């Protein structure tokens, strides 16, 4: 595969409970915000795992991940100097519209692709809403890029409640919304943006086996004029216009 390469781990640190930030050397193609990589997590797992590009600069790539199974557990144990086998970047990424009033919305580890987006978007005004259950992470990296609002479901940090409540309040002040997070959050973004007639792009998170559209394991249902069809999250996405997706 023409995107296959090896990369040396530069750092791998835990930034919250079971959430890690890994940086590694990158001499491959420059990613577009919203694209992802397929990484060999080694161990007994034989399928690569998808990880959004969290940040990129000066031949260094950063990913954000949560330990959820054997693959990510293996990844969390890697040290500086270890070698990763990677393919990518894959997918379409976000369509960046210049000169707009922008709202970026992230939920939990779904904030992963949004930092790089926030750095690259050329907005007239940039608002950033980050939602967490209780423990927050990476908020400081978003500060200074735009006007940041943080919510936690328990109210331990920032505003108490769901991040979608911020979207409901601000939807009339923006031209486009970009979001990534749990499906209930993305469905709420879809409903809020469509009701307000505001553009919205969402990045879907799905389990993937190949990352190139061959296995059809990440298919999602999308609207068609006469019903619905299926698109591949890895090849046709992972970013879709919100009104396309059928949850």
Curated annotation (Swiss-Prot):
Coiled-coil blocks: none
Pathway: Pyrimidine metabolism; UMP biosynthesis via de novo pathway; orotate from (S)-dihydroorotate (NAD(+) route): step 1/1
Entry binding sites for FAD: 49-52, 64-66, 71-72
Note describing how the cofactor binds: Binds 1 [2Fe-2S] cluster per subunit.
Pfam family of the protein (one): DHODB_Fe-S_bind
UniProt KW keywords: 2Fe-2S, Electron transport, FAD, Flavoprotein, Iron, Iron-sulfur, Metal-binding, Pyrimidine biosynthesis, Transport
NCBIfam families, alphabetized: PRK00054.1-3
Protein name: Dihydroorotate dehydrogenase B (NAD(+)), electron transfer subunit
Native species: Caldanaerobacter subterraneus subsp. tengcongensis (strain DSM 15242 / JCM 11007 / NBRC 100824 / MB4)
Gene that produces this protein: pyrK
